[in-house]
């Protein structure tokens, strides 16, 4: 596929153009993301874990791809994201970078790779950028990790924050529960989001919070908010791609299924097996002379 065939994308020098409508190809940057919020332009983010899928999403015009620690669930088969390590995610991130030409690729910092100190966070982030080619990293937490964000940003690492339902803290939260209900809890989450913004984060994910709180945080922050179960008023929306495409066996309430990929794959595998059993595959068309 030539560069002329790819969906157009904004370059930093073309901030007046929409995120989905620039004239020349080029990687999406944090400046483009900021400009989209200033224009009131909403955009989508998806997870990706391999080059082939990432390339499809890139061709579809998805401007930001997240190599999430959700790979623990949908790639490695863990019940939570907690077992995921930097060494798990670096090859996945590198594959997504290689498979794309336009999307910004954000890598999750997994549990245990950054919480101890800002220096530990920088070490992990540097590995993702040097070894995998990530364009930014994401970490979970609010006020407590603000010094970590400040350290990373000061070293030249773009940082995406994440507050609300933070899967790495699932045990401390008592399970996958909606966060920020009630005025006091909502105020705490707003304070956390503002702390991330003040520390230099270029965007913040809002997960599993009431719609009204998502709107309030979005209106308060100058940086973009990315909702996942946070209502329709966030600046952007993100889904795990297996949930979005109907590959996951179970999906959370906030995940709309836009396809039934599981059924398509199951039918294809069933038909293939039946053809082989019947001697109907391979035919001469699929054989060499």
Q: What is the meaning of each model-derived region?
A:
Residues 2-259, 263-289:
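Alpha/beta enzyme core
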């Amino acid at each position: 596929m030539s560069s002329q065939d790819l969906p157009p994308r904004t370059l930093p020098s073309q901030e007046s153009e929409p995120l989905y409508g620039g004239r020349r190809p080029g990687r999406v940057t944090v400046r483009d993301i900021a400009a989209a919020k200033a224009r009131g332009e909403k955009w989508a983010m998806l997870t990706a874990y391999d080059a082939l899928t990432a390339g499809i999403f890139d061709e579809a015009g998805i401007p930001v791809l997240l190599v999430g620690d959700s790979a623990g669930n949908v790639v490695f088969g863990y019940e939570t994201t907690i077992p995921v390590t930097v060494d798990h995610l670096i090859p996945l991130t590198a594959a997504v970078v290689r498979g794309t030409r336009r999307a910004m690729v954000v890598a999750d910092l997994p549990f245990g790779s950054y919480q101890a100190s800002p220096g530990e966070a920088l070490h992990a982030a540097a590995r993702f950028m040097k070894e995998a080619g990530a364009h930014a990293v994401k970490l979970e937490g609010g006020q407590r990790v603000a010094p970590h964000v400040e350290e990373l940003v000061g070293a030249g690492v773009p940082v995406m924050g994440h507050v609300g339902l933070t899967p790495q803290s699932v045990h401390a939260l008592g399970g996958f529960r909606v966060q920020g209900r009630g005025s006091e809890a909502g105020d705490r989450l707003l304070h956390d989001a503002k702390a991330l913004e003040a520390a230099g984060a270029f965007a913040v994910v809002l997960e599993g919070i009431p719609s009204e709180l998502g709107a309030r945080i979005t209106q308060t922050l100058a940086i973009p908010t990315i909702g996942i179960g946070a209502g329709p008023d966030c600046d952007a929306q993100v889904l795990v791609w297996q949930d979005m495409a109907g590959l996951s066996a179970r999906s959370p309430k906030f995940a709309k299924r836009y396809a039934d990929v599981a059924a398509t794959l199951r039918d294809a595998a069933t038909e293939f097996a039946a053809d082989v059993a019947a001697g109907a595959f391979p035919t001469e068309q699929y054989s060499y002379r």
